[in-house]
C-alpha cells in the first residue's frame, strides 16, 4: 500500500517533468 502511494507520487512528478521536457531532446520524458 505504501509502495503504491510512492508510485503515484513519482507518476505526478514524472508528469511535471514531461511538461518541462518538451524542448529538451536529451530528456527521457517527452510531451505527448
Curated annotation (Swiss-Prot):
Keywords for this protein: Acetylcholine receptor inhibiting toxin, Disulfide bond, G-protein coupled receptor impairing toxin, Ion channel impairing toxin, Neurotoxin, Postsynaptic neurotoxin, Secreted, Toxin
Result when mutating residue 32 to Q: No significant change in potency on human CHRNA9-CHRNA10 nAChR
Parts forming coiled coils: none
Main location as per UniProt: secreted
Outcome of swapping residue 25 to V: 480-fold and 5.8-fold less potent to inhibit rat CHRNA9-CHRNA10 and CHRNA7 nAChR, respectively
Entry comment on modification after translation: The disulfide bond CysI-CysIII is important for alpha-9-alpha-10 subtype inhibition, whereas the bond CysII-CysIV contributes to GABA(B) modulation.
Family per record: Belongs to the conotoxin A superfamily.
Domain notes: The cysteine framework is I (CC-C-C). Alpha4/3 pattern.
Protein name, entry field: Alpha-conotoxin RgIA
Amino acid at each position: 500500500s505504501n509502495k503504491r502511494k510512492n508510485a503515484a507520487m513519482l507518476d505526478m512528478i514524472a508528469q511535471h517533468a514531461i511538461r518541462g521536457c518538451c524542448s529538451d531532446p536529451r530528456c527521457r520524458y517527452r510531451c505527448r
